[in-house]
Amino acid sequence: MLSKIDYLPPNTALRPAANYLAKAFSEQCDQYFKNPFAVFDLPLKPLGTAHQQKVWSATQAIGVGSTSTYGEIAKQIKSGPRAVGTACGANPYPLVTPCHRVVSAQGLGGFMKEDAPGFYRQIKLWLLRHEGAI
């Protein structure tokens, strides 16, 4: 089972997938980068608190090319926007569980615990553009 996904920094040397699961993830990423409507089908190891699970489940319902705000997710699961943002920041499966589709009411918002322009927010921006959401 897949327990965590990390984005690699630019210029990281790539190496062949070490096992079946890594190969499946790599192939599914290739499909997603060709077509943002490609579906990830990977065995995920359930992690996180009950609240985090609710947030991550709600993000799964946000379709490709769409976004939802932290406040909208909070209202849906009877929580607060900051708690939703914290749960998104703790998401162990970025890309597969699409927390990049959750945005601030005032704009892009943070991504992977980063709330200032930087590496992860550049990824969020690219993903949303790739999916046609912005």
Named regions from a protein language model:
Residues G107:
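Iron-sulfur (Fe-S) cluster-binding segments and ferredoxin-like electron-carrier domains
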Residues L95-S104:
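Short Lys/Arg-enriched helix C-cap and helix-to-coil transition segments
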